[in-house]
Amino acid sequence: LGSGKAWDLSRKRDGLFFLPPFGKQDQDISNSRIEALESIRHFLVTSKEDYVLLSDCDIICNIPYHDVVEAHIRNQADITAVYQHGIIPQHMSEPTVYSVEENGALRDMLIHPKVDGPCNYGLNMYVINRPLLIELIEDCVSRNMYNFNRDFIQRNMFQYRFYCYEFKGYSKVICST
């Protein structure tokens, strides 16, 4: 990315941030995404942005995130998950499968299901309203619930406006095992 100037990201405030998986001095490594997010809570609280994009680092794709954010805003969603239709990649860890309404609203979500054919599988990319993200992180931590898919997403999927965005481009899961 270099300085990020070509993408208007070379600012002292806002722009693009790559955050470490742990943000506390007394913490060597995070065991879950929720712990990692909780460790950067101060950054999330002081940020002025309305939305947060969460993405794992083991999927390669050329996705227009601005389209995902626009769909999130257009749907007045609280959470938008990115998915792809096809066969679940072999090395995807804890795959999620979405049942999606025609308008993109989430109908159901399964974690690590037995699926033999094509389905709507999650790419572990989410756009979330920042204040809601902070609230849900605090709730999960206070209840000692640290599984992102089960405790953060699945447990809350019918309490909030949850939509899905279909990515129709090429993607590949990176696996070093």
Please report, for each region that a protein language model flagged, where it lies by residue.
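Unchanged
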Residues: L1-T177
